Amino acid sequence: MKPTAMALMCLLLAAVWIQDVDSKSMLTVSNSCCLNTLKKELPLKFIQCYRKMGSSCPDPPAVVFRLNKGRESCASTNKTWVQNHLKKVNPC
């Protein structure tokens, strides 16, 4: 393979990898509204507290869970597991 083609392929792979890493970390919070919500259930043991999103945020209605290591993740309040977790976790 030519060196320029190899370099171009490496750059392309790096760009795809960075995009994938970035999209996973952005599954959380953007200022005051959730852009995306979790697809899978978050174990209760990782959650410290929660806060509800304001009414000015677009659908779906969501909460932000503050996790043990200072991270935050959004979850849709339409999901049964989220409603159950809200009964067991204190607001922030």
Swiss-Prot record:
Upregulation: Produced by T-cell after stimulation by antigen or induction by concanavalin a (Con-A).
Gene3D superfamilies listed in its UniProt record: 2.40.50.40
Keywords, alphabetical: Chemotaxis, Cytokine, Disulfide bond, Glycoprotein, Signal
Annotated signal sequence range: 1-23
Gene Ontology BP annotations: cellular response to interleukin-17; chemotaxis; immune response
GO cellular component, one term: extracellular space
Superkingdom as given in the UniProt entry: Eukaryota
S-S pairs: C33-C57, C34-C74, C49-C92
Classification via InterPro entries: Chemokine_b/g/d, Chemokine_CC_CS, Chemokine_IL8-like_dom, Interleukin_8-like_sf
Short name of one Pfam family: IL8
Residues linked to a glycan: N78
Family annotation (SUPFAM superfamilies): Interleukin 8-like chemokines (SSF54117)
Alphabetized GO MF terms: chemokine activity; cytokine activity
Outcome following mutation: N68K: In strain: DBA/2J and SJL/J
Protein family membership: Belongs to the intercrine beta (chemokine CC) family.
PANTHER family associated with the record: C-C MOTIF CHEMOKINE 1, SMALL INDUCIBLE CYTOKINE A
Function description: Cytokine that is chemotactic for neutrophils.
UniProt name for this protein: C-C motif chemokine 1
Species name: Mus musculus (Mouse)
Gene this protein is translated from: Ccl1
